[in-house]
Amino acid sequence: MTTTVGIVVKDGVVLATDKRVTAGYYIAHKKGEKLWKIDDHVAATMSGGVADLQNILSFLTVRAREYKTQFRRPIPIRALVNYMSLILFYSRPYVYVVHSIIGGVDEEEGAVMYMVDWLGTVTKEKYVATGSGSPYAKGVLEVGYRGDLTVEEAVDLAINAIKAAIRNDPGSGEGIDVVTITKRDGFKRIFTTQQKLLIPEI
């Protein structure tokens, strides 16, 4: 149970998550890290089985480094997504209980984001939410998303989407992590005034 959000804008991608880690109805951790830096130009969110996703995203991180060493350039994001999809597809009948948003900026597609589900299904998205709080977050995204959003506006929208989930979903809570991936700055963690004030408000 969790909430993760991704938004694509012209200049980059914004990813955001809550920080609550649950085991059934038990709050197992209050400072969970659900954002994973794969390389300077790409990151992923984690929703579902933490151990499964940590294992798979470790594979992706190593693959990205191997590609950069071999070809002297960052790995295309679609290649990473395809690699994850193959891992999930060929793991059957064992199923990894995972859901991930992978997004960033590359030379082939510019700012781009994909969602990968536990069966290996891949969908290209402009905005998306996963996890138990996704119905609440998705509603905020549906109302607030525009094609001409700036990165800063997308950060605010992502925070508001996670905020709605925290207010309504018992599986989400404790705080918000936000990262941006842009061509100019690469991977960057965001700490905004709204983010810092979020917990007292709730």
Curated annotation (Swiss-Prot):
GO terms for cellular component: cytoplasm; proteasome core complex, beta-subunit complex. Residues 1 form a propeptide. Its main location: cytoplasm. Keywords: Autocatalytic cleavage, Cytoplasm, Hydrolase, Protease, Proteasome, Threonine protease, Zymogen. One of its GO terms (biological process) is proteasomal protein catabolic process. It is found in: Cytoplasm. Pfam families: Proteasome. The keyword Cytoplasm applies. Its EC number is 3.4.25.1. The keyword Oxidoreductase does not apply. The active site is at 2 (nucleophile). SUPFAM superfamilies: N-terminal nucleophile aminohydrolases (Ntn hydrolases). The formation of the proteasomal ATPase PAN-20S proteasome complex, via the docking of the C-termini of PAN into the intersubunit pockets in the alpha-rings, triggers opening of the gate for substrate entry. Interconversion between the open-gate and close-gate conformations leads to a dynamic regulation of the 20S proteasome proteolysis activity. It comes from the Archaea. It catalyses: Cleavage of peptide bonds with very broad specificity. InterPro entries: Ntn_hydrolases_N, Pept_T1A_Psome_bsu_arc, Pept_T1A_subB, Proteasome_bsu_CS, Proteasome_sua/b, Proteasome_suB-type. GO terms for molecular function: threonine-type endopeptidase activity. Component of the proteasome core, a large protease complex with broad specificity involved in protein degradation. Belongs to the peptidase T1B family. PANTHER family: ATP-DEPENDENT PROTEASE SUBUNIT HSLV (PTHR32194:SF0), METALLOPROTEASE TLDD (PTHR32194). The 20S proteasome core is composed of 14 alpha and 14 beta subunits that assemble into four stacked heptameric rings, resulting in a barrel-shaped structure. The two inner rings, each composed of seven catalytic beta subunits, are sandwiched by two outer rings, each composed of seven alpha subunits. The catalytic chamber with the active sites is on the inside of the barrel. Has a gated structure, the ends of the cylinder being occluded by the N-termini of the alpha-subunits. Is capped at one or both ends by the proteasome regulatory ATPase, PAN. This is Proteasome subunit beta 1.
